[in-house]
């Protein structure tokens, strides 16, 4: 909860720190929720009904609380019976008449937000009456008066609800004394139609008055209403008074302000409201008078005159002069004259300004011919205010008699009724010509004001057609029809009376057809909406359609419009109504023959004058068909059909126009097309051929064979006489009933018979269609080429004297000859083959063909043809003029070819490509497959084709030989292309100083390259971004590219692009090729020495950056092997060469390109000996020096043997431990490295003395070949001398000396800089003072000379004191260096680290020492660092000089070597081991595993760090303790962070649980015995246990309280016996837990409280229990494993008491399964009882009976304590007891009878079961079924009755019937029977 006084900043901080899902609730609570009032003031009262107040919140549910219950109580109000309260009632409970206060707090139950209300209780000091008005009207609505109470400070009380007041009418001192109740009356709310508050209704029922009342006016006058508080306590509070005036509700007509002209008058009327109706009042008035007051004159008026005069008798006001005055009501009663509510009116006397017109109806000046209109002329003053027009005003109104007829007009001319006569535009005029006689004036006042108005008159609006009828379509297809409008202005608004039936657009387009019905479409004139026209629209059902008469046959290509009429037929009157438009209905056009007619233009349908739709069908093929037109998708199938025929156009095929034949030759004339015989009347078909001269020709009709066309008509015409005539062919059908207007067609041709005049022989050219013929015959050349490879056909044509070619000359005799038979000859020179051919004129003629045989030889031959005469017996006249011979000279040539056949041409106007044509006739047709791509110029003289490109594209150049036999054109494939792409091909990584080839290609479309001869047109050039490389054009060039030589000059990167410009000036740039010039690629080290099994990684420098993958190979893999990372492992002694290449694969060629390569010499040796490398053997005390193991040679460094497999171990020892300490590396950070990593140590000198250091190197296996001679160990030792450092003074004041290496510098600083003037100088007194230089400012520089100098530093203080200090500076060479690590690592007590934690950040610091171990203060050494592998550490220079930063990224040992580049012998080697610092191992983690993470890392104070997890939904982790639960499969990373020291991590891979493993203690089993111990079912989700790692108590607590891993597991049980109709969940309660002790999940199965019936059923149930579990996150994913749990039900007894007599025997019946019954123990507690052995029931399975009797009845009766029979079972741990009591003596006789009855009952029982057996034998089917069920279901049918005594469970031997006679069957039996007979219901 937020405190009320909290600062705003804190509130906002809390607001934004809320969880997102609470933010909305917080906003509601703080910004939206509030109480209806913040403060409440309640009146003090001693009456029983205290004053309540309703406090209400806006939203939410609240708990209300009052801080001062004695003063204020609060009662919540609940909504609709719920526990949610938004309102509460405040009641003042104060009993003291003093001011008390309380705070009401309302707390919201969800957000806990509190609302506050301050409540005060005080005494009423005074009261007053509040009213919205002080004036009432007679018979008007009543007025509400309210009491407002104030305290002594003037504060208003919040409510007075419930307080009793006395209202009364008091005497008005100002008015005359009358009866008090005559003016006003106090009303109850029940008497008025008002809705008062509920408390007022209750008070009025009790005849009390509250703080609110109603008063009503009775008659005019004044009245006083008084109120006081009824409660006696407030009798001293003064009453409140209010004075009310009651007025009459009168009106002045007109009530608005009036404007008059001078001399005009107006007569007023007065009306009043009586009982809701307005009634006019006659003058004079009873209570009022009218007066003109406040006369205000305008400038220039006469003050002696009034503005207007009033006639009081008639209420007429006459305007006198300009100005204004008020007409007011004055009350005759003097006391009422102060009333302000009486009506009044202001009268303005003005001058006229202008006139205006108004017209009715419509109010628009757009009129209609024949209509009557009212035109009103209005007068306005200069302020545009309308002036009242009196009768004495004169207005002249003028209009055209041609356009208007005046029907009525007023005397003053302001009102006219006219009728419009004709259409047109006319102007009306009005003029104010008033002559008003002013009073006391002799001159009349005249006005001349005019106005005119333009009027447009139109004809009445008429819509065409008179009505519209549309068919209704059930699919909602709408009809659209444009209504035509006549009359009106032409601009209309359209509307529909029923838009569901018909809608209309703004253009008058009616849409209807979706809904049946009718509607009226109305068109209103926009200029005058009162003018309109309408049309009725009907949407009706379509019943009938028909096709109207039309022409039935038509020529192909022509169109027939088929008109369609559709109707709605009234079912009663049979009247047919034709639809106006049905063109939008979808029509289905079906033909019995497809393809004869088709729908034209996708079915154009349009209505006409006699039809509502039409179908246009086009004749497409000859034939006839029955066309059926129907409406698709309609409710009733409407259709109509008709037959149509189509025929081809009639034409003369041969001849087309003229036929020319020789004498006695025949012309076959062919006509085609024309009408077919009409299918319905074929007998009326006719055809005829008529001629002019029948004797000159003989005509015979040729009957065509079946294979010829049916519509062709052939006639053979034989020439009998020379001459010319016209033949006419007609075809068609005669008119008939079924075809009244059939089509008839005719065509005419000319027939000529003549002598031949000339002949022509030409080779026959089979030119392709569409090409021109051979031009040789036109040129009349002497030599005509023909093919020397193929036989040629020579054609003979014959012409008459007019040059016309003959159609047939077969009657002539001819002879053929060849001049050179070796070149060509004729096989039959006498005959000629007549071939019919169309020679291009469209007419077929017969030509003479002769085959010329060739012998594939070139040459020239002359061919001749001789004419011998006619083949007839006699010849006609004039034959002597005929030709005798014709000849032609031929040249034999080969076919033409095009060179080149393929080419890609650059699209540039300067490009001209030449294609040569070789051989052929020389007469060619050049064709292109595409136009406008190139400009083709055929150069006939050169026999070539020139192509100039115009547009890009692909084309085929076809060359046709026009004068050779056609086999096909010679072709060339040509591609014209713009520049599409520039391609640069080069190796983009070049080693400095090397050269590579650069190939430039320009590609066109489809990646085809251009020839380089076009490059000059393209302006191809190369451009470099920088000059780190050079380019040189090569002399040797490829045809399709330009080649350059690129030479690398400087290391760096640049970009090379190729640039070209096309014909439009657009630049094309190739993809930039980034060229990297890299330094020479080098592998490090140049030579590598390894022992067998040792691994070291090859490093590299130089080469392309970022470096590509280096491909390693080794020359001898028996010596060493290398992997892809460059890690070399020694195999056996020997040498090998390792090659490393940087290469890539060219994407275009697929070739491997090698950028650079280098090699390393590999030597694998055996360690012959080891030696300890110590840089110095004489050291001062208190210094450190690294020592490490080396081989015999300097190349056998720790890199050579520190990473062998198996590892070598290094054991160090000393002869004297008090002289120095020998510690492993990284001991400064508390790391304890194992012996395998101790190849390097650190010597810490302690005291002066001499000691020996020894190292022993051991190999675990002599067969590994690591040591020479298969030795197992090698050793070495050295001596170290430690001496005391020279000291001049005692140790507490030892002066310091500056130690500098040679060629270094050091900047000195003092503590007085800035405060004093500090200077320094090198003293010259020392002989070697030249070893350093000093600039005077504290900068020391050492040279290349070793020695010692003295430095003097002087400080001149501002206060007059000089300080001087002298120190020594020694310059010496660096002897050795040492690597130390940082930061320090701390572990828990008793724990050590053997490696750096994974993920840790390390800092390595390099320190330098001289030959005796003194540390240098400055450095100038150039260091080189090397690693034996780079995959475990990320290492690099630190942020300070001579420091290195490293990150441990992988497990393993890395050997770090550091040495001086100028002095490689000065080196140090350290092992850096990295291991996991977080336990346990997380390799095999499954969903559900609980992991207790731990680490031995702590901070310097021994405190652990903080745990973090990368993904909490995979491994839910408690960050405080470091325990996690694997909830989902995936990968997560666990972090342990010790701030400022170390941050380590471990990756956790969570696998999906393959299967849940279930188990339980085999010694346990399930039972349903009450209070039985819980059964435990153990579940494991992984392979073993689910608990990983060892858990601390805090982690175990977090598992139990925070992580709750058991929520992952769901446990289930089920009885194995499926026939047992009891769910296991009714018997057992099951839930899951996680056991930290066992590390597995546990399902706890406990027994629920069971009913007796359930225990009874289960007691004999032979069943087990299936148990299984599922993971919540992986439900249904894996196979479910179930385990069978043994179940032993508890036995059941229905008896708790025996009442036995002297000779009675009780039967103790126990139900249970067999093994339970066998383990029962039954014993009695009294010696007077006897329990006989049990016996099994033969009829009922699972029932055992024990007999109980009393041995000594008398002694048993005298027992003071009750006797028991105890029944127990060891299997189920169940114990039951039955009380045995003795029967009293009073029931002896009855008991004897009962004993007899008992015997009878026993016999009856036997009879009952005997009867049951008999019935069973008669009902074999039932018993068989029942036996089958009993066999399957092991639950027995047991009748265990309940006793009939008053004590349930007791057994009375004499007074109870036997148990097996109980009338109520048990639950299982009834359930079994119901199940048995209700199998399928």
Swiss-Prot record:
The chain crosses the membrane at residues 1804-1824. Residues 1078-1150 form the BIG2 domain. Keywords: Glycoprotein, Membrane, Nucleus, Signal, Transmembrane, Transmembrane helix. The keyword Cell membrane does not apply. It comes from the Eukaryota. Its main location: nucleus. Residues 1-32 form the signal peptide. One of its GO terms (cellular component) is membrane. Glycans are attached at residues 80, 344, 808, 1441. GO terms for biological process: Sertoli cell development; spermatid development. Coiled coil: none annotated. Belongs to the NUP210 family. This is Nuclear pore membrane glycoprotein 210-like. It comes from Mus musculus.
């Amino acid at each position: 909860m937020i405190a009320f006084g909290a600062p705003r900043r804190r509130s906002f901080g809390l607001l934004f720190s809320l969880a997102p899902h609470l933010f909305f609730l917080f906003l509601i609570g703080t910004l939206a929720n509030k109480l209806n009032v913040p403060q409440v003031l309640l009146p003090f009262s001693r009456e029983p009904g205290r004053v309540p107040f309703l406090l209400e919140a806006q939203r939410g549910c609240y708990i209300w609380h009052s801080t001062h219950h004695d003063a204020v109580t609060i009662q919540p109000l609940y909504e609709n019976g719920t526990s949610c309260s938004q309102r509460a009632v405040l009641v003042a409970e104060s009993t003291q008449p003093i001011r008390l206060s309380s705070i009401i707090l309302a707390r919201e139950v969800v957000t806990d937000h509190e609302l506050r209300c301050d409540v005060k209780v005080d005494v009423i000091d005074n009261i007053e009456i509040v009213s919205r008005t002080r004036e009432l009207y007679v018979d008007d609505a009543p007025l509400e008066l309210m009491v407002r109470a104030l305290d002594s400070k003037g504060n208003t009380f919040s409510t007075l609800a419930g307080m009793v007041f006395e209202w009364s009418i008091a005497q008005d001192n100002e008015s005359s004394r009358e009866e008090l109740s005559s003016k006003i009356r106090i009303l109850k709310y029940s008497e008025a139609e008002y809705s008062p508050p509920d408390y007022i209704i209750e008070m009025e029922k009790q005849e009390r008055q509250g703080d609110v009342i109603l008063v009503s006016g009775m008659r005019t006058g004044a009245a006083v209403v008084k109120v006081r508080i009824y409660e006696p306590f407030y009798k001293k509070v003064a009453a409140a008074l209010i004075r009310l005036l009651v007025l009459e509700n009168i009106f002045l007509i007109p009530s608005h302000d009036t404007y008059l002209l001078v001399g005009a008058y107006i007569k007023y009327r007065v009306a009043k409201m009586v009982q809701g109706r307005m009634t006019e009042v006659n003058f004079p008035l009873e209570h009022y008078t009218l007066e003109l007051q406040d006369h205000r004159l305008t400038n220039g008026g006469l003050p002696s005159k009034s503005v207007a005069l009033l006639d009081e008798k008639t209420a007429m006001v006459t305007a006198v002069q300009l100005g204004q005055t008020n007409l007011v009501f004055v009350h005759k009663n003097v006391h009422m004259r102060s009333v302000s509510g009486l009506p009044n009116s202001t009268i303005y006397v003005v001058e006229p300004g202008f006139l205006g017109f108004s017209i009715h109806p419509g109010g628009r000046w757009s009129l209609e011919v024949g209509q009557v209109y009212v035109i009103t002329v209005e007068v306005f003053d200069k302020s545009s205010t309308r002036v009242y027009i009196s009768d004495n005003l004169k207005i002249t109104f003028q209009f055209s008699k041609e356009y208007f007829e005046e029907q009525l007009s007023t005397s003053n001319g302001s009102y006219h009724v006219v009728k419009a006569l004709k259409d047109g535009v006319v102007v009306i005029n009005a003029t104010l010509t008033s002559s008003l006689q002013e009073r006391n004036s002799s001159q009349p006042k005249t006005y001349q004001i005019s106005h005119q108005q333009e009027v447009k008159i139109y004809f009445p609006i008429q819509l065409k057609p008179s009505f519209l009828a549309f068919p209704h379509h059930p699919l909602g297809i709408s009809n659209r029809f444009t209504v035509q409008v006549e009359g009106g202005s032409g601009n209309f608004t359209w509307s529909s009376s029923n838009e569901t039936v018909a809608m209309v657009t703004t253009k008058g387009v009616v849409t209807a057809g979706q809904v049946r019905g009718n509607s009226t479409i109305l068109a209103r004139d926009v200029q005058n909406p009162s003018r309109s026209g309408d049309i009725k629209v009907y949407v009706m059902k379509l019943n009938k359609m028909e096709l109207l008469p039309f022409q039935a046959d038509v020529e192909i290509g022509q169109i027939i419009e088929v008109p369609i009429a559709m109707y709605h037929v009234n079912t009663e009157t049979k009247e047919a109504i034709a639809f106006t438009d049905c063109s939008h209905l979808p029509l289905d056009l079906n033909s019995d023959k497809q393809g004869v007619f088709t729908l034209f233009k996708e079915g154009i349908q349009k209505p006409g004058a006699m039809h509502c739709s039409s179908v246009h069908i086009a004749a497409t093929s000859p034939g006839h068909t029955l066309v059926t037109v129907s409406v698709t998708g309609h409710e009733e199938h409407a259709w109509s059909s008709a037959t149509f025929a189509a025929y081809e156009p009639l034409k003369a095929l041969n001849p087309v126009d003229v036929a020319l034949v020789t004498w006695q030759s025949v012309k076959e004339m062919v006509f085609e097309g024309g009408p077919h015989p009409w299918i319905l009347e074929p007998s009326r078909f006719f055809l005829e051929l008529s001629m002019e001269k029948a004797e000159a020709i003989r005509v015979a009709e040729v009957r065509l064979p079946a294979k010829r066309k049916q519509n062709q008509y052939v006639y053979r015409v034989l020439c009998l006489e020379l001459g010319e005539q016209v033949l006419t062919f007609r075809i068609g059908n005669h008119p008939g009933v079924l075809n009244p207007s059939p089509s008839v067609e005719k065509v005419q041709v000319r027939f000529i018979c003549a002598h031949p005049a000339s002949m022509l022989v030409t080779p026959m050219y089979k030119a392709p269609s569409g090409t021109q013929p051979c031009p040789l015959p036109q040129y009349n050349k002497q030599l005509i080429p023909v093919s020397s490879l193929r036989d040629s056909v020579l054609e003979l044509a014959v012409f008459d004297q007019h040059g016309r070619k003959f159609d047939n000359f077969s009657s002539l005799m001819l002879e053929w000859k060849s001049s050179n038979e070796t070149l060509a000859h004729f096989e039959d020179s006498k005959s000629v083959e007549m071939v019919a051919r169309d020679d291009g004129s469209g007419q077929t003629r017969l030509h003479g063909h002769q085959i010329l045989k060739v012998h594939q030889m070139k040459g020239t031959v002359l061919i001749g043809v001789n004419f011998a005469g006619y083949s007839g017996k006699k010849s006609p006249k004039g034959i002597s003029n005929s030709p005798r011979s014709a000849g032609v000279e031929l040249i034999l040539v080969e076919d033409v070819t095009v060179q080149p056949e393929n080419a890609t041409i650059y699209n540039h106007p300067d490009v001209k490509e030449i294609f040569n044509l070789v051989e052929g006739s020389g007469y060619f047709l050049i064709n292109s497959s595409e136009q406008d791509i190139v400009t083709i110029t055929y150069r006939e003289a050169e026999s070539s084709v020139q192509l100039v490109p115009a547009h890009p594209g692909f084309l085929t150049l076809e060359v046709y030989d026009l004068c050779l036999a056609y086999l096909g054109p010679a072709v060339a494939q040509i591609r014209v292309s713009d520049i599409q792409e520039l391609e640069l091909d080069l190796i983009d990584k070049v080693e400095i100083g090397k050269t590579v080839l650069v190939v430039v290609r320009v590609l066109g479309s489809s990646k085809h390259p251009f020839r380089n001869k076009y490059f000059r047109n393209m302006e191809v050039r190369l451009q470099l971004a920088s000059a780190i490389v050079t380019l040189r054009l090569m002399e040797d060039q490829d045809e399709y590219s330009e080649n350059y030589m690129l030479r690398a000059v400087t290391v760096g990167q640049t970009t090379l692009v190729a640039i070209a410009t096309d014909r439009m000036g657009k630049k094309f740039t190739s993809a930039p090729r980034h060229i990297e010039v890299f330094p020479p690629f080098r592998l490090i080290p140049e030579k590598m020495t390894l022992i067998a099994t040792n691994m070291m990684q090859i490093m590299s420098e130089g080469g392309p950056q970022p470096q590509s993958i280096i491909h390693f190979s080794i020359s001898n893999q028996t010596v060493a092997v290398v992997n892809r990372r460059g890690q070399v492992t020694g195999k056996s002694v020997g040498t090998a060469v390792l090659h490393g290449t940087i290469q890539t694969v060219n994407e275009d060629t697929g070739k491997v390109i090698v950028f650079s390569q280098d090699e390393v010499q590999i030597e694998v040796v055996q360690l012959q000996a080891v030696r300890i490398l110590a840089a110095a053997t004489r050291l001062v005390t208190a210094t450190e020096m690294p020592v490490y193991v080396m081989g015999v040679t300097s190349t056998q460094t720790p890199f050579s043997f520190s990473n062998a497999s198996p590892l070598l171990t290094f054991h160090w020892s000393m002869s004297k431990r008090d002289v120095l300490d020998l510690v492993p590396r990284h001991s400064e950070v508390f790391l304890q490295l194992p012996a395998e990593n101790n190849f390097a140590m650190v010597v810490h000198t302690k005291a002066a003395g001499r000691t020996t250091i020894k190292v022993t190197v051991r190999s675990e296996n002599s067969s590994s070949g690591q040591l020479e001679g298969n030795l197992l160990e090698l050793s070495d030792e050295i001596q170290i001398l430690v001496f005391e450092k020279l000291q001049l003074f005692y140790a507490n004041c030892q002066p310091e000396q500056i130690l500098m290496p040679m060629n270094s510098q050091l900047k000195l600083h003092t503590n007085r800089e800035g405060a004093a003037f500090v200077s320094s100088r090198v003293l010259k007194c020392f002989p070697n003072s030249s070893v350093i230089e000093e600039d005077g400012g504290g900068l020391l520089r050492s040279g290349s000379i070793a020695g010692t100098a003295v430095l003097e530093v002087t400080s001149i203080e501002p206060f007059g004191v000089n300080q001087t200090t002298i120190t020594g500076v020694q310059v010496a060479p660096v002897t050795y260096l040492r690597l130390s690590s940082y930061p320090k690592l701390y572990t828990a007590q008793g724990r050590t680290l053997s490696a750096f934690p994974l993920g840790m950040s390390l800092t390595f610091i390099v320190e330098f020492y001289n030959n005796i171990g003194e540390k240098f203060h400055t450095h100038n050494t150039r260091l080189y660092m090397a690693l034996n592998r780079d995959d475990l550490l990320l290492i690099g220079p630190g942020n300070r000089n001579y420091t290195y930063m490293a990150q441990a990224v992988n497990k393993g040992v890395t050997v770090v070597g550091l040495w001086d580049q100028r002095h490689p012998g000065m080196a140090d080697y350290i092992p850096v081991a990295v291991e996991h610092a977080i336990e346990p191992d997380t390799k095999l983690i499954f969903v559900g595993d609980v992991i207790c993470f731990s680490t031995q890392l702590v901070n310097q104070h021994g405190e652990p760090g903080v745990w973090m997890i990368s993904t909490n939904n995979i491994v839910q982790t408690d960050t405080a303790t470091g325990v996690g639960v694997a909830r989902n499969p995936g990968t997560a990373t666990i972090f342990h962070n010790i701030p400022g020291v170390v941050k380590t991590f471990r990756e956790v891979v969570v696998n999906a649980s393959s299967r849940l493993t279930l188990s339980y203690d085999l010694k346990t089993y399930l039972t349903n015995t009450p209070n039985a111990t819980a059964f435990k079912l153990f579940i494991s989700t992984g392979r073993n246990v689910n608990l990983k790692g060892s858990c601390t108590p805090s982690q175990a607590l977090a598992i139990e309280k925070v992580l709750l891993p058991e929520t992952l597991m769901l446990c289930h049980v089920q009885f194995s016996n499926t026939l047992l109709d009891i769910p296991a969940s009714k018997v057992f309660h099951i839930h899951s837990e996680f056991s930290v002790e066992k590390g597995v999940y546990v399902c706890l199965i406990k027994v629920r409280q069971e009913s007796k019936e359930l225990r009874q059923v289960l007691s004999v149930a032979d069943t087990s229990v299936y148990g299984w579990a599922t993971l919540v996150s992986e439900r249904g994913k894996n196979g479910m494993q179930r385990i069978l749990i043994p179940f032993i039900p508890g036995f059941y007894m229905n008896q708790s008491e025996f009442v036995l007599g002297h000779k009675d025997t009780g039967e103790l019946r126990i139900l249970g399964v067999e093994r339970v019954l066998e383990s029962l123990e039954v014993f009695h507690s009294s010696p007077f009882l006897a329990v006989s052995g049990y016996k099994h029931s033969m009829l009922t399975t699972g029932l055992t009976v024990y007999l109980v009797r009393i041995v000594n009845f008398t002694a048993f009766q005298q027992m003071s304590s009750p006797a028991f029979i105890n029944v127990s079972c060891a299997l189920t741990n169940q114990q039951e007891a039955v009380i045995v009591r003795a029967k009293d003596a009073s029931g002896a006789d009855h008991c004897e009878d009962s004993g007899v009855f008992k015997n009878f009952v026993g016999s009856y029982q036997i009879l009952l079961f005997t009867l049951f057996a008999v019935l069973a034998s008669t009902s074999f089917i039932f018993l068989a079924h029942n036996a089958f069920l009993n066999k399957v279901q092991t639950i027995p049918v047991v009748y265990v009755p309940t006793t009939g005594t008053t004590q349930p469970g007791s057994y009375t031997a004499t007074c109870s019937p036997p148990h097996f006679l109980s009338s109520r069957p048990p639950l299982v039996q009834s359930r079994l029977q119901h199940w048995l007979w209700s199998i399928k219901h």
